Curated annotation (Swiss-Prot):
PANTHER family: RIBULOSE BISPHOSPHATE CARBOXYLASE (PTHR42704), RIBULOSE BISPHOSPHATE CARBOXYLASE LARGE CHAIN (PTHR42704:SF17). It comes from Bradyrhizobium sp. (strain BTAi1 / ATCC BAA-1182). This is Ribulose bisphosphate carboxylase large chain 2. It holds the Pfam family RuBisCO_large_N. GO terms for biological process: reductive pentose-phosphate cycle.
Length: 479
């Protein structure tokens, strides 16, 4: 019988994957998980189990460990911190060598970090809170097809946020009536209109007909206003082949921008479409449909800041970011944090905004945040203050719900935006003086006056479910 050269059986994960003395390398991919361990499982063991299952480990010792340099390839749980205000949960910091991941593949990174490990019995709940992508890995990814500056250059629009509108009702309109709504909104002063996330190619409106009527409206509004206009044509489809077919047709009609539902369609499809857009001079708007399934539970899933980083690597020129003030979930400081991750070339660690690591994007272009969901003219001062210029504000019901029609709703939003930008440029505190600023502008715009009257009582004041963990950040002394 051959002599054993390893110890068979099951051993504690922490004997291999808990390395409290490890100092992460600049080339390591770093992740922080929020963990609630099962009763009786030590925190170091739970953290090590996550590191093992998301890298090289399995449930028992295997002899093939001897055929590789396991000490190099393994994930390392190197730090544990408490979660403020929660005695059961803790943060586990894990470092992964960059060679564990295929270059330029968000798919491969997520398959490791949020794959089988999320069903692990050793933990009651698990949430991926943040990732530090090393610059060496960032450089292997394509990123946004165009970026904020190139988009502004193509549109010839500077010094203010862009304005958009999601056409409503989201389902049921004929292609001709849909195109009519697009034309009225663009003629009234908006920069963009948009397909909703679930508009694809349904019996009431096939995608070819929608594309044709919409682009007729875009060209007509562009000609009449002298401003460059666009509509986010949703090319999300059942297959990649069909997706590219729709993208090519949009290009043939002169569309400047197309749209993709990146989570429901998947990162493989999204990265491929981003590459196509880069090669074909097309802007790419990204909708985040399905994100709340993954990110809203504060104890289990993937935080949206992680999805934001992954999208920037995969590719997209716009991404829905939440509004803070509208109908959709969004903590203010957390939202500002992931907006910075979308736009800035370097974002330092900032626990007050939920950012656990420095993130260096190198020369990768930024993604324009899109504030959309339950917003109207009364929100314009806050939106201007929160997002600044490099953002797109999308008013669906806040445009189409105007008593005088779509064009009037668009005009009201444009007047409100320009009033807020002018006030900000004059040094006025826009958010604090928002009511006064809008009231002054409404004296010269009956459309804005009616919009303000229509939505003066509409607020979405619900408590945020996914709040930032707050309190003193005390580091646990490693045992």
């Amino acid at each position: 019988m051959a002599e054993k050269s390893y110890q068979a059986g099951v051993k504690e994960y922490r004997k291999t994957y808990w390395t409290p003395d490890y100092v992460p390398l600049d080339t390591d991919l770093l992740a922080v998980f929020k963990i609630v361990a099962q009763a009786g499982v030590p925190r170091e063991e739970a953290a090590a189990a996550v590191a093992a299952e998301s890298s090289t480990g399995t449930w028992t010792t295997v002899w093939t460990d001897l055929l590789t340099d396991l000490d190099y390839y393994k994930g390392r749980a190197y730090r544990i911190e408490p979660v403020p205000g929660d005695d059961n949960a803790f943060y586990a910091f894990i470092a992964y060598p960059i060679d564990l991941f295929e270059e330029g593949s968000v798919v491969n990174v997520l398959t490791s970090l949020v794959g089988n490990v999320f069903g692990f019995k050793a933990v009651r709940s698990l949430r991926l809170e943040d990732i530090r992508f090393p610059l060496a890995y960032v450089k292997t990814c394509g990123g946004p097809p165009n970026g904020i500056q190139l988009e502004r250059d193509r549109l010839n629009k500077y010094g203010r946020p862009l304005l958009g509108c999601t056409i409503k009702p989201k389902l049921g309109l004929s292609a001709k009536n849909y195109g009519r709504a697009v034309y009225e909104c663009l003629r009234g002063g908006l920069d963009f209109t948009k397909d909703d996330e679930n508009i694809n190619s349904q019996p009431f409106m096939r995608w070819q007909h929608r594309f044709e009527f919409v682009m007729e409206a875009v060209h007509k509004a562009t000609s009449e206003t002298g401003e460059r206009k666009g509509h986010y044509l949703n090319v999300t489809a059942p297959t990649p082949e069909e997706m590219y077919k729709r993208a090519e047709f949009a290009k043939s009609l002169g569309a400047p921008i197309i749209m993709h539902d990146f989570l429901t369609a998947g990162f493989t499809a999204n990265t491929g479409l981003a590459n196509w857009c880069r090669e074909n001079g097309m802007l790419l708007h990204i909708h985040r449909a399905m994100h709340a399934v993954l990110d809203r539970n504060p104890m289990h899933g993937i935080h949206f800041r992680v999805l934001t980083k992954c999208l920037r690597l995969s590719g997209g020129d716009h991404l829905h970011s939440g509004t803070v003030v509208g109908k959709l979930e969004g903590d203010r400081e957390a939202t500002i944090g992931w907006v910075d991750l979308m736009r800035e070339p370097f974002v330092p660690e900032n626990r007050a905004r939920g950012i656990f690591f420095d993130q260096d994007w190198g020369a990768m272009p930024g993604v324009m945040p899109v504030a959309s969901g339950g917003i109207h003219v009364w929100h314009m001062p806050a939106l201007t203050a929160i997002f600044g210029d490099d953002a797109c504000f999308q008013f669906g019901g806040g445009t189409l719900g105007h008593p005088w029609g779509n064009a009037a709703g668009a005009h009201a939003n444009r007047v409100a935006l320009e009033a807020c930008v002018e006030a900000r440029n004059q040094g006025r505190p826009v958010e604090r003086e928002g009511r006064e600023i809008l009231t002054e502008a409404a004296q010269h715009s009956p459309e804005l006056k009616i919009a303000m009257e229509t939505w003066k009582e509409i607020k979405f004041e619900f408590d945020v479910v996914d709040k930032l963990d707050t309190g003193p950040m005390l580091r646990v002394v490693n045992a």
